[in-house]
From Swiss-Prot:
The keyword DNA-binding does not apply. Homooligomer. Interacts (homooligomer form) with ATP5MC1; this interaction facilitates the oligomer formation of subunit c/ATP5MC1 (c-ring) and the c-ring membrane insertion and also protects ATP5MC1 against intramitochondrial proteolysis. Interacts with the core subunits TMEM126B, NDUFAF1, ECSIT and ACAD9 of the MCIA complex. Interacts with ATP5MC3, TMEM242 and TIMMDC1. This is Transmembrane protein 70, mitochondrial. GO terms for biological process: mitochondrial proton-transporting ATP synthase complex assembly; protein complex oligomerization. One of its GO terms (molecular function) is mitochondrial proton-transporting ATP synthase complex binding. Belongs to the TMEM70 family. Residues 79-112, 158-254 are mitochondrial matrix. It holds the Pfam family TMEM70. The chain crosses the membrane at residues 113-133, 137-157. It is a multi-pass membrane protein.
Amino acid sequence: MLFLALGGPWAAGLRLSGKRTALWASSALRDPRAAVSRAASCRGSSGRVGGTGLSAAAPVLRRVRAQIPVCWERGVRCSHTQLDKSEDGRLIYTGNLARTVFGVKCFSYSTSLISLAFLPYIFAQNNVIFGSLPLQILFYGTIGSFTVITPALLHFLTKGYVIRLYHEARTDTYKAITYSVVLSEKSTVFHQNDVKIPNSTHVFTTFYAKTKSLLVNPALFPNPEDYNHLMGYDKPFTFDLEEASEKKQLKEEK
């Protein structure tokens, strides 16, 4: 009160310092970097008054810097765990042709439905459009191929394409997601011991899960160790010549 009543230079410095401290605190909440640069410029220009404002605003800056990264770190950590882990296990594979397969099958099914919708009209105009029997056979064969054969062939070729693959490490089980006939997601659960590698190379089969053929791309596994464990390549390789010779002798005796 004495300083304010005297109106001396100290009182003016205190009033100016208080105003600048409030400005620094408010700007620090909006943009910490701008507040630091502004405080440094004020300190260089005004000397003692700027230094007082910077020292008063420093705890606010430290508090903002200490709090924001912690919140970001928690948010990133939570989102990371939610994406990687689910009820089916850990996502280890995602097919890059899932949308392509879905789109091609949808187009094939739509053309089949359109052909079936126009069949009554075509049957009604049969005698008018086609006069000869060979033309009728050719026309109906073409419609039949687009209506039945093409969707069936596409489903046969893509029924084993794996959209997503999950792995449960505790039970060492896998869950493969594929497309069904009606384009709904179908799950196949199998153990690692159920995986069988075909003796010869197949275009649309990478391995057999029990009796179901599945197709995956080894290059799309983010972790190559997951693919090696799936195929059983991480197991120790044992080859007993005596057992092989005994089996061969038994076959020859039979």
